[in-house]
């Protein structure tokens, strides 16, 4: 009874009203044993609970919640008075009436949970060793704080909110920062309200950068199947897969009615146009360009010319005008080069029609008496990339001999890749290609229409290698074996055999008739 009487006297001396008390069950022996025993390793919850004092002012979360819900006003005044008196008694160093105060009040408190006076009273930090989830699950988590507004200036609800906010902020800091503003800021910028946030100019910078990127991309060359423009309109009517190249050879025809000009486009292994072979001569002027020229290329892509309503439309118009100007320059360049080389072109016939997948598509257009090969080298320039063409006229050698054999031995090795019947000549024309790797020499062999015994061989190009090693040993052996037959004695024996064979046949016939 004396102890119960001392407690109210202490509270009366401090002038604070009485506070509600809860009777706690005694601790079991095992808990006391683990708390005070030697040689045992306590669990994590025991360690956390030992870090906080065991006085009545620092109870479990459920007890604090029950006390706050029962009488918040009374508990607030009592807790404030008790806390002030405890700090005063600890500061004076007196232990006369400190039965309710644990001397481990400040010694066992972890340094990570200490709140500095220089910081804001509503903020605290979580130590690195403890996660917010572990701290919330601890039964003595809110023992550091008063159940109501105390010396720390926050309730346990506010403490929970602070811990949750810090956990969310820590997770947000671990994620990579995005370069785009929140949707709310972008929406406020696009709505055009009077109050614009601080980060509102960021979408405007993004829009300007997008304009610059798109304009730069519009100047880059595109590697498409269509070759560089030469001032004329072409229609693709066939293609063929060439041995040794991943890209097929494309065949084009001029779209102008009555124009017989055709061309072939060959590409290298990397997809670049390496050779354009024209066939025939245009019988019309180059078509006029209907698109806008350089005079209309006055689109301004500055910030003053782009607004929120017409930014995309002006951007599309500027791209169209830029592409038109680049194409106009290329067409002018190609028209000049085409005009200087048209005198080397000859007329073409309509004897060749090539379709997709047909097997009669040959390596070369057959009705081409004087072809013109154009090797292209693509160079990228800074303002507007264009293809600079280099015209190469390969030498042609025509050899006419009288022979019964079409293919004459000239020392090189050839591979036949095509054959075609030419209009006006009943004899077919055969096409051959040099088998040496890297050599582009071709030849076609045909008999003259006026003299069937005359063989006309036309060579195109120049060999870039020496003569291959001829099979002289085999030819010499064959010639040596044939030399005895050429002697007069050999001819006499051959004549005798020829004379005897008809007699034998006559005898067989006579035997069959009898």
From Swiss-Prot:
Coiled coil: none annotated. In young, mature and senescent leaves. GO terms for molecular function: DNA binding; DNA-binding transcription factor activity; metal ion binding; sequence-specific DNA binding; transcription cis-regulatory region binding. Residues 300-313, 469-480 have a biased composition (Low complexity). Residues 223-287, 403-468 bind DNA. Residues 1-28, 175-204, 278-394, 464-514 are annotated as: Disordered. SMART domains: WRKY. This is Probable WRKY transcription factor 4. It comes from Arabidopsis thaliana. The gene is WRKY4.
């Amino acid at each position: 009874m004396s102890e119960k009487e001392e407690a109210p006297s202490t509270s009366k001396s401090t002038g604070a009203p009485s506070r509600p008390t809860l009777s706690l069950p005694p601790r079991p022996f095992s808990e006391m044993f683990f708390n005070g025993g030697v040689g045992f390793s306590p669990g994590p919850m025991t360690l956390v609970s030992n870090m906080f004092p065991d006085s009545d002012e620092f109870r479990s979360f459920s007890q604090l919640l029950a006390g706050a819900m029962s009488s918040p006003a009374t508990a607030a005044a009592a807790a404030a008075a008790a806390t002030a008196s405890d700090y005063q008694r600890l500061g004076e160093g007196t232990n006369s009436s400190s039965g309710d105060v644990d001397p481990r009040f400040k010694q066992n408190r972890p340094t990570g949970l200490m709140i500095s006076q220089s910081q804001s009273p509503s903020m605290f930090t979580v130590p690195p060793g403890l996660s917010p989830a572990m701290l919330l699950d601890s039964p003595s988590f809110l023992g550091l704080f008063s159940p109501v507004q105390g010396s720390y200036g926050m309730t346990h609800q506010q403490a929970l909110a602070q811990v949750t906010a810090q956990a969310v902020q820590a997770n947000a800091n671990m994620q990579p920062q995005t370069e785009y503003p929140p949707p709310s800021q972008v929406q406020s910028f696009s709505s055009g309200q009077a109050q614009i946030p601080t980060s509102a100019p960021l979408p405007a910078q993004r829009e300007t950068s997008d304009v610059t990127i798109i304009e730069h991309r519009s100047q880059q060359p595109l590697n498409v199947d269509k070759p560089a423009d030469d001032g004329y309109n072409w229609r693709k009517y066939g293609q063929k897969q060439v041995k040794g190249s991943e890209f097929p050879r494309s065949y084009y025809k001029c779209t102008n009615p009555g124009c017989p000009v055709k061309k072939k486009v060959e590409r290298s292994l990397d997809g670049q146009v390496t050779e354009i072979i024209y066939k025939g001569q245009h019988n019309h002027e180059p078509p006029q360009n209907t698109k806008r020229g350089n005079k209309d290329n006055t689109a301004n892509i500055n910030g003053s010319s782009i607004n929120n309503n017409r930014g995309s439309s002006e951007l599309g118009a500027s791209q169209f005008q830029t592409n038109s100007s680049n194409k106009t320059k290329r067409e002018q360049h190609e028209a000049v080069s085409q005009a200087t080389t048209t005198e080397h072109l000859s007329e073409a016939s309509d004897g060749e029609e090539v379709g997709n997948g047909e097997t009669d598509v040959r390596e070369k257009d057959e009705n081409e008496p004087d072809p013109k090969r154009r090797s292209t080298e693509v160079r990228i320039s800074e303002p507007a990339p264009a293809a600079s063409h280099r015209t190469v006229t390969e030498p042609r050698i025509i050899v006419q001999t009288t022979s019964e054999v079409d293919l004459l031995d000239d020392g090189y090795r050839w591979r036949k890749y095509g054959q075609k019947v030419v209009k006006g000549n009943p004899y077919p024309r055969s096409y051959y290609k040099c088998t040496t790797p890297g050599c582009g020499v071709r030849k076609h062999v045909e008999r003259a229409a006026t003299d069937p015994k005359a063989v006309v061989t036309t060579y195109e190009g120049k060999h870039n290698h020496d003569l291959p090693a001829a099979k002289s040993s085999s030819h010499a052996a064959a010639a040596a074996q044939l030399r005895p037959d050429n002697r007069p004695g050999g001819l006499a024996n051959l004549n005798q055999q020829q004379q005897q064979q008809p007699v034998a046949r006559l005898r067989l016939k006579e035997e069959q008739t009898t």
